[in-house]
C-alpha cells in the first residue's frame, strides 16, 4: 500500500511540474507578442530614453507631413493629447480617428516613435 501511494504522489508531482513548466514557456512567449500600452492621460513623467508604448486615437487635423517619410501627429484619449514624431512607412490603416499604438521613447521633450501599430475592430478587411 505504501509503495502505491508513493508512486501516485510521484506521478502527481511530475504532472504538476510539467504543467508549471509548460505554462511558464507559454507565458514567456506571449510576453514578447502581446502589446500593452499607456493612454496619454496615464503618462506623467517619462524618463528620457526609456522605451514606452503609447496608444490612443489619431486626433482630427493633427497629421503634419514634415518630409517624404517623416510625420508628426497627435494622439488623444479624449482626456489628454500627446504629440508623436514618426519616420518610416505608415501602416495601411493609419488615418484620423484611427486607434494607434506608438512604440518609441522620449527625446528632448518629444516622443519619437520607431514603430506604429494600427488597431482595428473585429471586422478587419485588408485594403484592396
From Swiss-Prot:
Disulfide linkage: none
Cytoplasmic side, ranges: 1-8
SUPFAM superfamilies noted in UniProt: Heme chaperone CcmE
Periplasmic side: 30-128
Source organism, top-level taxon: Bacteria
Membrane spanning stretches: 9-29
Compartment(s): Cell inner membrane
Gene3D superfamilies: Nucleic acid-binding proteins (2.40.50.140)
Membrane topology: Single-pass type II membrane protein
Keywords: Cell inner membrane, Cell membrane, Cytochrome c-type biogenesis, Heme, Iron, Membrane, Metal-binding, Signal-anchor, Transmembrane, Transmembrane helix
Annotated residues for binding of heme: 120, 124
Primary location recorded for the protein, binned into one broad class: membrane
Family: Belongs to the CcmE/CycJ family.
Protein name: Cytochrome c-type biogenesis protein CcmE
Organism: Rickettsia peacockii (strain Rustic)
